[in-house]
Regions:
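A short mixed-secondary-structure module that forms the rim of ligand-binding clefts
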Residues: 35
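N-terminal intrinsically disordered, cationic/polar leader segments
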Residues: 1-32, 41-42, 47-109
């Protein structure tokens, strides 16, 4: 199962997210749930890097399917929009394939 956690500060502003695990929907190379989640997460990070003037840190473990993205400061309008867009896509995958394959959590830090 993939567990995505979106980190927020006490004001509800997004400050990062992590994605851990594999969906287990199908075998490697055929797992469309894993591919969809990966595409959304990586596209969000790449979009923030290319279109937003923010500092961030990324830690990734390709073998384990783990990635953690943390902003240096709470999300501004553009980076928050991109993170919210990723969340919308992840909720769509969760609705279509269920909680057996993806869990989306929000955590105040």
């Amino acid at each position: 199962m993939i567990e995505v956690t979106v980190y927020q500060n006490t004001d509800g502003k997004k400050i990062g997210f992590s994605s851990v695990g594999h969906a287990g929907y199908d075998e490697y190379g055929h797992d469309i749930v894993c591919a969809g989640v990966s595409a959304l997460v990586i596209n969000c990070i790449n979009s923030i890097e290319n279109f937003c003037d923010v500092r961030f840190k990324v830690d990734a473990d390709d073998e384990g399917g783990n990635i953690k993205f943390m902003l240096a400061d709470p999300a501004d309008g553009d980076s928050e929009l991109l993170i919210n867009s990723m969340i919308l896509g992840l909720k769509g995958i969760q609705n279509d394939y269920g909680n057996d394959y993806i869990i989306l959590n929000f955590k105040e830090v």
